Structures are given as C-alpha cells and as structure tokens.
UniProtKB/Swiss-Prot annotation:
NCBIfam families: L28. This is Large ribosomal subunit protein bL28. Gene3D superfamilies: Ribosomal protein L28/L24. GO terms for biological process: translation. It comes from Frankia casuarinae (strain DSM 45818 / CECT 9043 / HFP020203 / CcI3). GO terms for molecular function: structural constituent of ribosome. Belongs to the bacterial ribosomal protein bL28 family.
Amino acid sequence: MSSVCDVCGKGPGFGMSVSHSHRRTRRRWNPNIQTVRTVVGGTPKRLNVCASCIKAGKVSRA
C-alpha cells in the first residue's frame, strides 16, 4: 500500500532509531494513511488520504 497522501502529498519521514547505548539504525515514520471512498469529478473513487486531511475536511466521503 502507498505511504503517500493523494491530497497533500505527505510521505514518510526518515531518521535514526537511537538505542540507550547510542547505536543508530535507519528508520522511517509513515503518515497515517487511510483508504477513503470519495467523489472525484462526479464518480466515486478510492483515494489514499492521510488522517490530517480527513480531520481538516479536505476530503468528502462518498
């Protein structure tokens, strides 16, 4: 499944996981992507939308 929002384009953030002994390994923080049925151009369509776009009302559910 895609980890990019179809509305705002938000994608994963990258960084390091740091243990107590300060060993560092690469990791990624994925946005909270939900599959939402919405009306685009008069036809219902499934979009991958982040939770912040759903909360902000940028997407109307079908």
